[in-house]
Amino acid sequence: MLYPTPIAKLIDSFSKLPGIGIKTATRLAFYTIGMSDDDVNEFAKNLLAAKRELSYCSVCGNLTDEDPCAICQDQSRDQSTILIVEDSRDVSAMENIQEYHGLYHVLHGLISPMNGVGPDDINLKSLITRLMDSEVTEVIVATNATADGEATSMYISRVLKPAGIKVTRLARGLAVGSDIEYADEVTLIRAIENRTEL
């Protein structure tokens, strides 16, 4: 159907979001148009504020509005363990289960030889630098159970083991090909409790 240009542009904008197809984008566009001016202004203000005010923690790479992030500043956390994840959504998933109390490191991607993504293309150098000046004794690799997640975990293991750092992987309660952010709390708790050494 042919929509007026402002609606068509709004539909196009919504459809660029992950997991949003044309039908959902159309519903969101029409819902937004039906909102009060105050609600639309608040939505736009919050969207712009999130984009402007958030950045990546200089220590762990997590999305934050302060630097270093609240997790890195929290001295009550276990300073001897770092859990490595693909992105900030995985940090949120792990924090929601309230079972892990160590630190994090966010890679912002995975090694993917098929897509031309190597170790230098993700946030690994800062991890190695961070580990040199720390009391970390264990690194838990919590990448997704995919080919790229496995390639990344094996690379991390090969790099860190010679330095005497214990490298473990989440237990396989997680289905192969699944994303950590979508796993239920019980599965994540068991995956941490039953992690295996690489």
Swiss-Prot record:
Protein name per its UniProtKB record: Recombination protein RecR
DNA repair recorded as keyword: yes
Organism field: Streptococcus sanguinis (strain SK36)
HAMAP family, sorted: RecR
Pfam families: RecR_C, RecR_HhH, RecR_ZnF, Toprim_4
PROSITE patterns found in the cross-reference section: RECR (PS01300), TOPRIM (PS50880)
Zinc finger (C4-type) residue numbers: 57-72
Residue ranges occupied by any Toprim domain in the UniProt entry: 80-175
Family in the record: Belongs to the RecR family.
Keywords assigned: DNA damage, DNA recombination, DNA repair, Metal-binding, Zinc, Zinc-finger
MF terms (GO), sorted A to Z: DNA binding; zinc ion binding
GO biological processes: DNA recombination; DNA repair
NCBIfam families referenced in this protein's UniProt entry, alphabetically: recR
